[in-house]
C-alpha cells in the first residue's frame, strides 16, 4: 500500500498510523503526499500527525512546497501550511506570510498566520509585525481576539508601545482588546475572560 493509499483509508486511526510511519521513516517522496493530504484531512489528530511528519523532513525540502500552499484557494490548505511552518520556525518563510496572510478573511487562516508570523519573524521585523497586528485589534469573536492577544503578547517587549498607544483608541472594542492584551503581557497565565472583564471595567462610564 502506498502512503497516499494509506492516508486515504476510511479509518482515522489507520490514517494516523500512516502519518506517524511517514514521520518515523522520512523520505523526500512523502512530502508532496503529506502536503496534499493536509488540504483535505478531516480529523484534527491526523492533521497534527501530518504536520509532525513534515517537520521530521529537512526544511530545505519542505519549505518550498509549503510556501506554495499559502497561495491555495482552499482555506484548510493555507492554515495547515501555516501551522506546519510555525512548527518548523524557519525565517525563510517570513516573506510569504507577512503581511498578506495576516489579513486573511478566513479567521482560522488569519489566527494561524499570526502565530506562524511570530514564530518565523526575524528579530528586526518583530516591532513592525507588532504594529501590523495592532491594526487588527477589535476583530472577531472571543477565539479570534484571544489568538491576536496571545500573538501580540509573544512579541513583547516590542509590542508594548503600540499596545499602550492603541489602548487610547476612540473605539471602545479596540481599546478593550488592547487593554486586555496588555494584561496578558503582564500575566500570560491570566484567563482571557478575566483579562477582557478587567479591561472593560477600566473604561470610563459614559
Predicted regions and their residues:
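Structural detector for internal amphipathic alpha-helices that build alpha-solenoid repeat scaffolds
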Residues: 5, 12-27, 36-37, 45-60, ...
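HEAT/HEAT-like alpha-solenoid repeats
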Residues: 30-31, 75-76, 129-133, 193-205
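Strongly charged, low-complexity linkers/loops
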Residues: 127-146, 154
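Eukaryotic acidic, Ser/Thr-rich intrinsically disordered low-complexity regions
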Residues: 164-206
